[in-house]
Amino acid sequence: MVRMSADELDAFLHRAFPQMDENRYRVEEVHERFARVRMAFDARHLRPGGTISGPSLMALADTAMYVAILAMIGEVPLAVTTNLSINFMRKPQAADVIADARVLKLGKRLAVGDVSLFSDGDPEMVAHATLTYSIPQRR
């Protein structure tokens, strides 16, 4: 069951993490165990060679998984990443990047998922990440 809509999650991220405005993220959609987050193209995300940098892709993957988890559990700001592993598969274009996050397992204390990243308009994956999140005990 989805507990937060894309608009609610987008508003929460921009309220709780003001730096999201700088990264130009937007929550586009959420469904059960799924979220799509877009990082709008900005020259600040480029590395030498004119490609989106690895740290920018990692931050987007982390944010997309956070969104997918919060969509399922509600507003739990203290859920934190405990592991992130990413494979860079091909050079991303200098364009918006789309992150599709899937929650594979959602437990009481841990969530595990993966994120596929794509340059906007290109069906070939540019990176794939697996993540584990710690979910704090509700009081």
Give the residues covered by each predicted segment:
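Hydrophobic residues in beta-strands and at strand termini
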Residues: 39-41, 88, 135
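Hydrophobic beta-strand-centered segment that forms part of the acyl-chain substrate-binding groove
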Residues: 67-98, 103
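HotDog/MaoC-like acyl-thioester-processing domains
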Residues: 3-4, 91-94, 98, 104-139
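Hot-dog-fold acyl-thioester-processing enzymes
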Residues: 40-64
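A generic structural signal for short beta-strands and their flanking turns/coil linkers
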Residues: 23, 33-35, 54, 76-84, ...
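Non-catalytic linker/capping segments at the edges of enzyme domains
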Residues: 1-38, 44
